[in-house]
Amino acid sequence: MALYHPGESGLKKTGDPLKKIVLLVDVQNIYYTTRDAYGRHFDYNRFWERATANRQVVKAIAYAVDRGDEKQRQFQTILRAIGFEVKLKPFIKRADGSAKGDWDVGITLDAMEYAKHADLLVLVSGDGDFALLVDRVRHDFGIPVEVYGVPGFTAFALINAATEYVPV
């Protein structure tokens, strides 16, 4: 899986202070898009290595839906061991068979809260609804936003809003 972008390396020069970053991961979005595109899971360890290299993590949150099964609890434990705070919403199955577990508002609120303490926001999602958030963070806080997403499954509006798009 391609994870590295030929753009900015994120490496600091000796003596420069570490860039303070906030990492926000839309777990459902990245799970389904990597599964559909590559037939496998997103590599959270590799992502963490790349996104945090020579950077200071101010906050790292993974937003997920809780179905209450053991396999998911184990996955959530792994995310916590990597360094993420895991925020959960209950999985709601509607009478018509559709499901609900959307974190868009929660991710947006946290981005606006923590961006003021960061030099960079890193968002992992392909959801075009976040294009407005990315624009707002860049404008209101004057910080760059890196978006990690799966090519072909990441909204063009989100890619265009980002300071840097990193294909997963």
State the predicted function of each range:
Residues G68-V168:
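Nuclease catalytic cores that cleave nucleic-acid phosphodiester bonds
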